[in-house]
Design a protein with these regions (language model features):
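Transmembrane-helix boundary/entry motifs in multi-pass membrane transporters
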Residues: 10-15, 22-23, 47-54, 68-112, ...
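Helix-loop-helix junctions that connect adjacent transmembrane segments
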Residues: 134-139, 143, 153, 157-242, ...
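Central hydrophobic cores of alpha-helical transmembrane segments in multi-pass inner-membrane proteins
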Residues: 34, 58-69, 141-149
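Membrane-embedded alpha-helical segments of transport systems
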Residues: 30-34, 57-64, 104-112, 233-243
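Short helix-coil transition sites and intra-membrane helix breaks within transmembrane domains
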Residues: 30-32, 73-77, 111-116, 202-206
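Hydrophobic alpha-helical transmembrane segments of multi-pass membrane proteins
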Residues: 27, 56-57, 101-112, 139-146, ...
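Membrane-interface helix termini and inter-helical loops of multi-pass transporters
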Residues: 39-46, 118-128, 180-191
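Membrane-interface "cap" regions at the ends of multi-pass membrane proteins
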Residues: 1-41, 46, 63-67, 153, ...
Length: 246
């Protein structure tokens, strides 16, 4: 680590410290969302081999993009993405204007993603308990919003146990799929539009921009552990995405 990295480590502002597994779990927990539900719909419109290499390609792209995000946050003391852009990309008289434009665009993107999660989660309550959709959305929002008050460390611990349980469930489901297969591996004619749609959904389903920034802070700017977390976390997320279509 050079002198600049050491200096940035000292300035890292974090409310809690994470273990490597907690950091990996935050990546996995934040990346696996409602988008994974749409993957099988798009996967069956491609051959299984196309799905495999597309998930692998999406993994490489995701790792590169999130390493860039991690470096931006790291170089600016663990700040959020928009603030990193302000420090690294925007200069001169238009700096504030570009920063606000980025804030609005990024904020809208997050709102769309969160809205999808709320609607998807609320639909489960509707199916289970027969609640009106608005009531289910409100309940899910309150439950999801309570995570903010738990703090980053408690969130990391919760994610650790959730991901461990998810690994067990996926392992059992995968074993059952191969031991008692109901269908052969599906094939479909190649079509570029179907492949691009699958790629877009896989990248969306495994994105974890905010989690990476929390990882940078939670690991106190330890570059080796940050890289290890990103490679491993997105590897597990890609594995989950690949298993679901089976």
């Amino acid at each position: 680590m050079n002198e600049k990295e050491k200096d940035m480590d000292k300035k890292m502002n974090s409310e809690a410290q994470l273990t490597t597994f907690e950091a990996i779990s935050m990546i996995v927990g934040n990346s696996i969302g409602t988008g994974i539900i749409a993957v099988p719909y798009l996967a069956v419109r491609n051959s299984m081999w196309d799905v495999v290499w597309m998930v692998a390609f999406a993994y490489i792209v995701n790792v590169i993009l999130h390493l860039i995000i991690a470096e931006l946050s790291y170089n600016n003391g663990g700040v959020q993405l928009v603030k990193s852009f302000e420090g690294e990309l925007f200069h001169g008289k238009m700096k504030k204007i570009f920063s606000w434009i980025m804030f609005i665009v990024y904020g809208l993107a997050i709102m769309v993603g969160v809205s999808g999660n709320i609607n998807g989660g609320a639909q489960i309550f509707v199916n289970w308990f027969g609640l009106p959709l608005w009531a289910a959305q409100l309940i899910y929002y309150l439950i999801a919003g309570s995570v903010v008050f738990m703090g980053m460390k408690a969130g990391g611990i919760a994610q650790k146990y959730s991901v461990a349980l998810l690994l067990v469930i996926v392992a059992v489901m995968t074993a059952g799929t191969f031991l008692h297969p109901r269908n052969t591996l599906y094939t479909a004619p190649f079509h570029i539009n179907n492949l691009l749609a699958l790629y877009s959904m896989v990248v969306f389903a495994t994105s974890a921009n905010q989690a990476v920034i929390q990882v940078v802070k939670g690991l106190n700017g330890d570059s080796k552990r940050i890289r290890k977390t990103i490679f491993t976390g997105f590897g597990l997320s890609s594995l989950f995405v690949l298993v679901v279509p089976l």
